[in-house]
Amino acid sequence: TGVIMPPKGYLKRLREICTKHGILLIFDEVITGFGRLGSAFAAQEFDVIPDLITCAKGLTNGAIPMGAVLVQNHIYDDMMAAGKGAIELFHGYTYSGHPVAAAAGLATLEIYRSENLLHRAADLAGYWEEAAHSLRGCKHVKDVRNYGLVAGIELESMPDAPGKRAYEVFVRC
């Protein structure tokens, strides 16, 4: 159902545990990145520095498929040192080298900056929360959760037909 936010302090404690045991902390910010929680990334919102951040969608405003993995310097340095004459972070090539997607990404990031969209998103959070939570008490709405501009609306399942009610709502909307 998604949009289940961690309790206060949870991610900071997780960072401590990962650091203590040499475990990489990875944040999947495909949904939460690019201002949806009020900061560029959820990591900033929760004041945690992960080792890797995955992001997509918001990178090009969803106009063209593009994803990225942001890594801390120590990971990049280790990857670069892995092979003689390494000239790049070996990341796979299925979706690399697409100038149109790169141009869309650069244009999107410039619009985020020039129109102050990350901060404007934070300003809209209260309105979005009120709108999403207005669905509480509606027929078949089991739960409503949100943080910033991200919301999850959980619908009751139909007996013996999981997903059917959500599909019917999708078709009507």
Which stretches of residues belong to each language-model region?
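Conserved N-terminal phosphate-binding loop of PLP-dependent enzymes in the Aspartate aminotransferase
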Residues: 1-173
